[in-house]
């Protein structure tokens, strides 16, 4: 289990890192790992970033506020749109930046369409088996219906998962009008439709 302050052995502690810090990027890129190891470290950093963002909340209306709108714009959206996937994209984009690794994730803010793109472009990363750091996707009514997502932070047997999710409330709802934010959740395993773990891309023996 990675140390939450320093998930990559021998690297700079995450609380000292910033994506725009060139020195940090060079230090991380000096880590001599294989492609799948590098992507695994991106995933681990995404979990750290997600934990740091717990407590981020909407301000001034549903799906509004400086932090929320920044995530939406960075993910190609507009203020006022649902932002659970924008939160996941933010965590992973910071992970890619920290590891000086190009993003492999599809863009977009619609959960079902994102799942479709992952299944087409990243089939070896997609599974119905959860792993810590994986992107958890919920779209039980099909690819075109509204969905939800989060980042897996813990697995409790075959019963439930711990996640960190954006655009959720303390009752566990999604995209409500009651002041959503970034919160840790525990949900039944069956709630989730698909898991995407980029650490499995290019792993030995995986096409």
Spans of features found by a protein language model:
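N-terminal capping segments
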Residues: 2-98, 202-207
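Aromatic- and glycine-rich peptidoglycan recognition patches
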Residues: 2-18, 25-35, 142, 146-207
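...with weaker cross-activation on analogous glycine-rich loops/strands in unrelated enzymes
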Residues: 42, 47, 77, 98-173
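Generic preference for flexible, low-structure residues
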Residues: 62-66, 104, 177-180
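Helix N-terminus capping/helix-initiation residues
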Residues: 65, 109-112, 188
